[in-house]
Regions:
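Generic enzyme active-site microenvironment
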Residues: 47-48, 135, 306
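Active-site-adjacent pocket scaffolds in enzyme catalytic domains
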Residues: 2-35, 110-114, 176-275, 318
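Metal-dependent polysaccharide deacetylase catalytic core of the NodB/CE4 family, i.e.
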Residues: 85-194, 218, 268-278
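Loop/turn elements at helix/coil->beta-strand transitions in domains of secreted/extracellular proteins
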Residues: 41-42, 82-88, 128-133, 179-182, ...
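Glycan-processing catalytic domains of CAZymes
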Residues: 55, 71, 127-128, 134-136, ...
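C-terminal domain-boundary segment and adjacent tail
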Residues: 36, 208-216, 220, 265-332
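Active-site beta->alpha N-cap acidic-glycine motif
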Residues: 14-125, 180, 185
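Well-ordered, non-membrane alpha-helical segments in soluble/globular domains
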Residues: 64-76, 109-121, 160-168, 249-254, ...
Length: 332
């Protein structure tokens, strides 16, 4: 409590910045009255944060930047085993892994860098052959407004105008690479405390966002939005993150059963990195992901359909989703 208070005082008093939503316990804004959206079946979306041209053989934590990286190889194994799954990658189009790259080499890990042309071509071909979607994960995955902590929260200190500019820049980078994202997830979950990032996402022309986990993003400090259903929010659809691949398998299975009972959406989320990062695609979690898919196929074939977030949004746009009458299940 004291640590958070000191940080908030530093942000407001020294930096003269708006306190991010993760520090703003006075913010009572809630979207819990937003009607849950459901479909005639439950969709399971496997999704990863942080795909970028940053390889394992750099001095940083790799993000699938080489075709020989562990996560790249394991992803291909997964697609060969289960070609029917959908994967949404929240991609970083111009990753800056340290401050050095702000000053000296901002294009090094850009998807537009000619040095990364083969990597980009590989992933675009992969998306053409399998059900893979690329969505925006900001531009840099790094913020320079607060140099002391939470450097990975790119949108934490950006107001509406700067958030919109950053999102527009992100979309432009993707478009130049031949990718047309319709979705977004904020790096590090955090956002400005007035939650105008939601308005910026809508104004940028994006169709959906993943802005909430159980305790991150819109659900920082208190629950503001559904844990288990997509909801319409200021002109965009919010998809929750509700299963992490580093959870115990029994907990994952129990959560899947609960979500199926509520006719919600199953969002199985990880980081596209081999190790160190929380919830990463390690060997252990890769094997667990295989077991998750097998479990769903064995117990819910015909009930659960694998998809990308874009697929589920398209169902909504086509009018195939409806308002749910289910009561929201509270997190235990």
């Amino acid at each position: 409590m004291l640590k958070a208070y000191i940080k908030a005082c530093y942000i407001k008093g020294i930096l003269r910045k708006q306190v991010p939503v993760s520090f703003d316990k006075k913010n009572k804004l809630s979207f819990l009255d937003a009607k849950p959206l459901t479909a005639d079946k439950v969709y399971c979306v496997i999704n990863f944060d942080d795909l970028s041209p940053l390889p394992d053989n750099s001095k940083f934590i790799g993000r699938g930047g080489s075709l020989e990286d562990f996560v790249s190889i394991k992803q291909m194994e997964l697609l060969k085993l289960f070609p029917f799954i959908g994967i949404t990658h929240f991609m970083i189009p111009q990753f800056l892994p340290s401050d050095y790259y702000y000053i000296f080499n901002k294009q090094r890990y850009s998807i537009l860098n000619a040095a990364n042309k083969e990597w980009l071509s590989y992933y675009k071909t992969l998306a053409a052959n399998f059900n893979i979607e690329f969505a925006s994960h900001g531009v840099y995955h790094r913020q320079a407004e607060n140099l002391l902590f939470a450097r990975h929260t790119e949108f934490a200190y950006l107001d509406y105008e700067r958030s919109l500019q950053r999102l527009t820049h992100s979309i432009s980078l993707f478009n130049k690479a031949g990718i047309n994202p319709i979705g977004f997830r904020a790096p590090g979950w955090d956002m400005n405390s007035d939650i105008s990032l939601v308005d910026a996402v809508s104004a940028a022309g994006l169709k959906y966002a993943g802005l909430s986990s159980y305790d991150g993003g819109l659900n920082s400090t208190r629950q503001r939005i559904s844990y288990y259903h997509p909801v319409m929010l200021k002109g965009i659809v919010n998809f929750p993150d509700n299963i992490n691949i580093d959870w115990p398998l029994d907990k994952i299975k129990t959560t899947i059963r609960n979500i199926v009972d509520m006719n919600g959406i199953i969002a199985v989320k990880g980081h596209f990195s081999k190790h160190i990062l929380t919830n990463s695609l390690s060997e252990e979690n890769f094997l667990k992901l295989i077991e998750i898919i097998k479990f769903i196929r064995a117990e819910y074939k015909g009930t659960i359909e694998f998809a990308t977030f874009k697929d589920v949004y398209t169902k909504l746009e086509d009018g195939k989703l409806s308002v749910s009458n289910n009561t929201e299940l509270k997190l235990q």
